[in-house]
Amino acid sequence: RRGNDARSRMARKSAEVEYDGSKYARRDVIGDMEIVNSFGRQTLIDFYHKWYRPDLQAVIVVGDVDVDAMERKIRDVMSSIPKAENPARKEVYDIPQRDKPRYGLVTDPETKAVAVKLIFYQPYPSEEERATVGAVRDELARKVFLEMARARLAEAEKRPDARYKRVVAVLGSLATCRNTFMLTALPKEHDMREALAGVLTDVEQIRRYGFSREEFEAARAKVARSEKAALEKYRLATNTDLAGRYVEHFTRNVPYVTPDDRTRIVGEQLDALTCEEVNGLRAGMTSPEGMLVLVSSSEEHLDKVPSEAEAFDLIDSVKRAKIARPERRGKSAGPLFTEKVTPGKVVRTRKAPLGAEEWTLSNGVKVFWRTVPEVIGVRKVGVTAVSEGGFARDSDVEGMHLLQNYIRTMGVKDLDRA
């Protein structure tokens, strides 16, 4: 809670590197900690009058209220606050765009975290750009690019010669300074040099050759499913959700869009995206120029951390290396069942506890079906299969749990988890 554990200390050290060159690199969430830890009464009063002023405030009311009466109350209370004289300008700070890669190492005596991150910086849309349909299209294109990269890296993990255990790819942003594309490689045997070499090579392959149309279509379909689920949640907004959207509009100029308009805009822009357009993002999403290599390590494994010089040498060698084109997948996965399935019948139905129904099938399987009240923003069907009987040794239990995770990760038959 005091932010003095290993994770918090590592996060602060990482932020100093990620935001380097910006005022944010010297500030915590609530400001310059030297001032926070030592300010006097007058400093606090001056800060209040400098920033807590009418032109930087908004009152947002959401609920079943008398609109006219509520507006009168707000005007009565707020209109007496005087306008600030010679108001301070609200500055927007940036992170400088570099033309060379950067390196950072963060560690802590108590941390167990061992990882290698590649962070690629892209421009953050301006206030004017955020209010356009183009901003929606750009964000959708980034999401499709992300899904293609995730699928490609997931395939790379499975290779016998993979040089890392796993790579996690995410999109993000640093305040309103920069958008980011971040890859976190988890090393084998704490070997961060090998992990860095491996992820650099896989990213360079993407940068050189891009993605195929088949990869694009699969990723776009996945983004479409994700957006559909998000739109259903958007449509089921609570008052708190609505208030949050209006706050985003006021503080970040993110326009509030009705559910119908949002559904239409997302659908139109996603349908209009092309493989060539998304492949065109490679320059900003995978270029080593301006890339940050950020290594997190426990102190006991510092001998396996690449130095700054070693990291830059690896970047240069990968840029010059011969890298084969990615292997294209063969035919798409076929149906789950290749033989005709003979349907059974429900031979008995009865009421079960907790409002459920019990169906006995002709093959003896019992199905318990229960409909639960809808939770706002959550629409899903949960299925659990249980087979009773038989014997298992204690030593088998661990393997059974491992098998569950294996199936969940690898998929079924020719169908992967995507």
State what each model feature region is.
Residues 1, 66, 85-99, 162-171, ...:
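Acidic/histidine-enriched alpha-helical segments
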Residues 1, 29-37, 56-64, 130-138, ...:
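Second-shell loop/turn segments in exported
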Residues 119, 146-186, 245:
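A structural supersecondary motif
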Residues 156, 173-232, 254-255, 268-272, ...:
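M16/insulysin-pitrilysin zinc metalloprotease superfamily fold
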Residues 271-304:
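Extended, domain-scale alpha-helical bundle/helix-rich regions
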Residues 1-47, 96, 102, 140, ...:
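Acidic/histidine-enriched segments that form metal/cofactor-coordinating
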Residues 38-47, 162-170, 276-279, 418:
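Short amphipathic beta-strand starts and helix->beta connectors
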Residues 45-161, 196-200, 297-418:
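His/Glu-rich zincin catalytic helix
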